[in-house]
Every structure is written in structure tokens, then in C-alpha cells.
Amino acid sequence: MASSAPPVLPISNPQTVPSAAPSSVESQPPIATPAFRNFINQITETVKNGLSKRRPWAELADRSALSKPESISDAAVRIRKNYSYFKVNYLTVATAIVGFSLVTHPFSLVFLLCLLASWLFLYLFRPTDQPIVLFGRTFSDRETLGCLILFSIFVIFLTDVGSVLVSAMMIGVALICAHGAFRAPEDLFLDEQEPAATGFLSFLGGAASSAAPAVIAARV
């Protein structure tokens, strides 16, 4: 006689209770808003386009093209022509000087980064439907703007951030003027220059002009 099949034991299959943590995580807004990502992407693309228009560094450092200007007016003309030709290179050098000055002053760099992050994430790219709540108090956009202005005044004028930035920019301007005054521009093809609006720092205007309408419309 065939053996009987073993009895089937009942197996309980408890229903898993969905955790509320994922829903709470999903309900939180992303840190990087679409406007902020768009702003960063536009700045990145425009910086790449600006750097692609820089002149060869060997041409900038050509010692055979250096000569003493005949007069102050001649030096001014040279500075204007050389700046029009080496605009991207000059601004790159000035930016490098400012960056080096901030790196050698880490506290100033930290203060400046905190100030920039505060403006970006607490005001410019913060969703309007998410007010700032601190110590149980809700801050309006006007109060947030006032606090950021006071924080900016404190960082720039009551710390060494302002002096570091001003001294670095003065050094950069002095180097640019010295090179522009002693660099003879006779061998430069100035007729091939782009309009002044296409300079390296125009990404500030271009990126800001694209992001500003959305931010202003959201704040109004």
C-alpha cells in the first residue's frame, strides 16, 4: 500500500506593515531645486564657452613683445587694447589670485561659503511654500531677506573677508594694468574681437538673467 502523504502544516504569512519612514522621506523636498540645478548648469556651460575663447598663454607671456610705453596716454591705450584681446586670460588670472587669497585665509573662505550658501538655499532657491521655522517661529521672506542682509554686512565688514577680497582684487588689477601697459599690442588682431558683452564674466549676467525671472515670479 502506498504511503500516505505527510500532512501539510499551516504556514502563517504575516502582512508586512509598510513603514511610515519612506513616505516621510519622499514627502521632503529635494535639496537641489530645479531652479538651482538649472542655474548651476547654465553657469557651467557658460564658463566652458568663456574659457574656450581665451588666448594662448604663451602669447600672453611673450617677453619679446614687452616694451616701455612712451607716455601715460600710450600706456592707457595699450591697457585698453590688451584688455580687449586678453580679456579672458586677465579675468582668469584675477580669479586665480582671489581664489589663492581665500585659500590662504581659510576662515575667510568658510565665512564666504556660508554667506553664499545662505543666500542660495535660504532665499534665492528656497520654495515659497516652505517658510523658514526657527525655534518655533516662522520667518517671512522679508524677515529672511533682512537677516541675510545683516549677515552679509557682518561677514564683509566685521570680518577679514572684505579686506582679503579687496586686497586680492587690487593685486589682480595692478598686475593686469602692468602687463597691459608694457605689452605692445601691435601684433594683435584686434579686428577679430567679439563684442564686450561676450566677456568671461558675462556668465553672471546670462545665468542670473535666466534664473531671476523664475525667482522673482515666485517671490512676488
UniProtKB/Swiss-Prot annotation:
Q: What does this protein do?
A: May be involved in both secretory and endocytic intracellular trafficking in the endosomal/prevacuolar compartments.
**Membrane topology label:** Multi-pass membrane protein
Listed transmembrane segments: 83-103, 105-125, 146-166, 170-190, 196-216
Q: Which UniProt keywords apply?
A: Endosome, Membrane, Transmembrane, Transmembrane helix, Transport
In the UniProt record, which is one GO cellular component term?
Golgi apparatus
Q: Write out the annotated subcellular location.
A: Endosome membrane
**Under what name is this protein listed?**
PRA1 family protein B4
Q: How does it assemble?
A: Interacts with PRA1B1, PRA1B2, PRA1B3, PRA1B5, PRA1B6 and PRA1E.
| Source organism (scientific name) | Arabidopsis thaliana
Main localisation, per the record? membrane
Q: In which tissues is it expressed?
A: Expressed in roots, lateral roots, lateral root caps, stomata and trichomes.
